[in-house]
Curated annotation (Swiss-Prot):
One of its GO terms (cellular component) is microtubule cytoskeleton. Pfam families: TAF1_subA. GO terms for molecular function: DNA binding. It comes from the Eukaryota. This is TATA box-binding protein-associated factor RNA polymerase I subunit A. GO terms for biological process: transcription by RNA polymerase I. Keywords: DNA-binding, Nucleus, Transcription, Transcription regulation. InterPro entries: RNA_pol_I_TAF1A/TAFI48_chr, SL1/TIF-IB_Component, TAF1A. Component of the transcription factor SL1/TIF-IB complex, which is involved in the assembly of the PIC (pre-initiation complex) during RNA polymerase I-dependent transcription. The rate of PIC formation probably is primarily dependent on the rate of association of SL1/TIF-IB with the rDNA promoter. SL1/TIF-IB is involved in stabilization of nucleolar transcription factor 1/UBTF on rDNA. Formation of SL1/TIF-IB excludes the association of TBP with TFIID subunits. Component of the transcription factor SL1/TIF-IB complex, composed of TBP and at least TAF1A, TAF1B, TAF1C and TAF1D. In the complex interacts directly with TBP, TAF1A and TAF1B. Interaction of the SL1/TIF-IB subunits with TBP excludes interaction of TBP with the transcription factor IID (TFIID) subunits. Interacts with UBFT. Interacts with CEBPA (isoform 1 and isoform 4). Part of Pol I pre-initiation complex (PIC), in which Pol I core assembles with RRN3 and promoter-bound UTBF and SL1/TIF-IB complex. It is found in: Nucleus, Nucleolus.
Length: 453
């Protein structure tokens, strides 16, 4: 059944010159390395005739070759593994097409001698063998074609899959059909964006402008139809949601866009997804929504990803709020951002923290700072304010070092290693800034005089 694909693999493989270290395939090809591995499946010097053990060993060799990116060797093993399609074990025989597709497509994608024609041939044969996997294979085949810039071929592939049916339609089959339709919608969205770009270069009075506008409207209707069913199904559908919302906004359907994004972010049937809240926030921001609404959206994002880049915007919104609860949360947000190693050189975060610490301490909210510092007192000094970091930060970015030095001085006192190191640096341009920092630390530090860290 798979002899044609076997021939394709044979073409890809290159035999070794030494026939003694090879195994002859049914197609007459010598397979290097295979002989010694087959010999490993022996008992008392005799080859096991057990079909399952042979194919199991072959599968292990394929997986090992894939992990090592040995595509040619994997192709050779794959040629032998095709016999699993004739396995006497019903379960294994039924599972074989999906395994062969996954392994074979991986090999053909990366093999240096593979090409689009070979991949297409393999995909088409696998669709007919593994009918239960038809939709999955069709979708992955389309993605492969997209990767190679073959948009029309990918679209035809998806259109064919869209109308395919096998037996009674199951719920899993319905989701796959929706996914196929949604990817078709993405292709239509791509065409729509190109038309939009062309439209932006035309004069509104131009005849071509009206024609392209009509084409775009038609394209957007098709896209909406194809994407709608999928985004109502619980799941993570970021690229589809973004595309759909962009078109809704372009045609002035703000209510439709808002409803879509709100459902995507808050519907409990959908999995937790930080991007859903990001998209909603960005939309509301474009709409110039009230600060309270923006804060409510970012508050949930903060709970999911406290180190998200939008947390600095969240802090700014909280800082400008009139409620003490928000202002206090604004301090927590900054500390939590800087709890993450990936943010320890974020100069904006350190600037915000330095400025906000001063503002809070002037406003007599000493206890807010103490509360945040209590849980960090034992690990932040080594994490942020060691002698090593003082030297490293000063060498890399003097502005960052100065901001951190002020924060270190406020939290740990003027005896802090980081603060003392920066204070001793002889830098003509920053001399006045360091002098002012010294005075500020003396004024605002939360550490009792005489305490050194």
């Amino acid at each position: 059944m798979m002899s044609d694909f076997g021939e394709e693999l044979t073409k890809l493989a290159v035999a070794e010159d030494n026939p003694e270290t090879s195994v002859l395939s049914k197609t007459g090809m010598h397979f290097p390395w295979l002989h010694k591995h087959v010999e490993a499946v022996v008992t008392g010097g005799k080859k096991r005739k057990d079909f399952a053990q042979t194919t199991s060993a072959c599968l292990s060799f394929i997986q090992e070759a894939l992990l090592k990116h040995q595509w040619q060797q994997a192709a050779e093993y794959m040629h032998s593994y095709l016999q699993t399609l004739e396995d006497s074990d019903t379960d294994k025989r039924q599972a074989a097409p999906e395994i062969i597709w996954k392994l074979g497509s991986e090999i053909l994608f990366y093999h240096p001698k593979s090409n689009v024609e070979t991949f297409n041939s393999f995909a088409d044969r696998m669709k007919n063998i593994g009918v239960l996997n038809y939709l999955k294979i069709s979708l992955q085949h389309a993605l492969y074609l997209l990767h190679h810039g073959m948009l029309d071929d990918a679209n035809r592939n998806l259109s064919k899959a869209e109308t395919w049916r096998y037996g009674e339609k199951s719920s899993s089959q319905e989701v796959l059909i929706n996914l196929v339709q949604a990817y078709k919608g993405l292709l239509q969205y791509y065409t729509w964006t190109r038309k939009k770009m062309e439209l932006s270069k035309l004069d509104e009075d131009d005849y071509a402008y009206a024609a392209k506008t009509r084409t775009m409207l038609s394209q957007s209707c098709k896209t909406s139809t194809n994407i709608c069913a999928l985004v109502k199904t619980p799941g993570v559908w970021d690229p589809f949601v973004k595309s759909y919302v962009e078109m809704l906004e372009f045609y002035g359907d703000q209510d439709g866009a808002r409803e879509m994004l709100t459902n995507y972010a808050y519907d409990e049937k959908f999995p937790s997804n930080p991007n859903a809240h990001v998209y909603l926030y960005e939309f509301l921001k474009r709409e110039k929504a009230p600060r309270a609404k923006l804060i409510s959206v970012l508050k949930i994002l903060h709970e999911i990803v406290p180190s998200h880049t939008l947390m600095l915007e969240f802090h700014t919104l909280l800082r400008k709020s009139d409620t003490e609860e928000h202002q206090k949360l604004g301090l927590s947000v900054l500390f939590e951002v800087l709890d993450f190693a990936g943010c320890n050189k974020n100069i904006t975060a350190w600037k915000y923290l330095a400025k906000y610490l001063k503002q809070i301490l002037v406003g007599s909210h000493h206890e807010w700072v103490e509360e945040e510092w209590k849980s960090r007192r034992n690990w932040w000094p080594a994490f942020h304010f060691s002698f090593f970091w003082a030297k490293s930060d000063w060498k890399a970015d003097t502005d960052l070092a100065c901001e951190k030095a002020f924060v270190a001085g406020v939290l740990l006192g003027k005896g802090c290693k980081y603060f003392r190191y920066i204070l001793k640096q002889d830098h003509e341009t920053l001399k006045k800034k360091i002098k002012r920092m010294k005075k500020s630390v003396k004024k605002y530090t939360i550490v009792n005089p005489g305490v050194h860290t």
